[in-house]
Amino acid sequence: CGTIRIVCEADATIDAASTVPAQSATRAAAKPAGEDFALRITGEDFDRTWETVAAYNAEDTSYSFPEGRYTITITYGDPEAEGVDKPYYAGSTEVEVAARRTCTAQITAKIGNSQALVRATESFKKYYNNAEFSVTTGAGNVFTFRPCDATEAESVWVQAGKPLTVKGTARGQSQDGMSEGPLYTFTPEPLEAARPATRHIFTLDARKAGSATLTVTLGEG
């Protein structure tokens, strides 16, 4: 029999192709410590899980494995959970256990879910106000954004590989400056499937009063 040493870390990279710094409201994902990952080790006639890598390390001096090939999988978070501060990480590797030897499983877990955000340009805010938009996920959750507010909302985590639909309303300029302006309803904008480790930004823009567009940007573009 031999032993397995687990060395793991989290890669919090999102929008890897983007070169534009993230705004403060779209801060980096929470990065778990290596020992906080849930652990699963599988092999021929072997399948066992540990609540954390720390729990495994606490007993690894006495835990040995028959010779053979094993798959080491680490996860953190819930892949089906959606909302603020709900990143999901996953990673795996394979090792060969030899008799009376310790092999090292080096694993980097990457983000497996996606982010969504609705924001408005300064040009849009010049012509519209009281905007309220909702992002509906493939899982059926609905998240509300008010992109004309002074403080931009945080991105929400959503399931990767599932559709996103954005729709909403905004008030146009008042003719007399006193009463409410006309209410505009925006046609739902669908996204077929959210990409893993990507921030999907739905941006409202307007070049003149009564004219507005809703575009989707992958990354911080």
What positions do the PLM features span?
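Extracytoplasmic cysteine-anchoring/structural motifs
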Residues: C1-E44, R48, A55-A58, S64-A99, ...
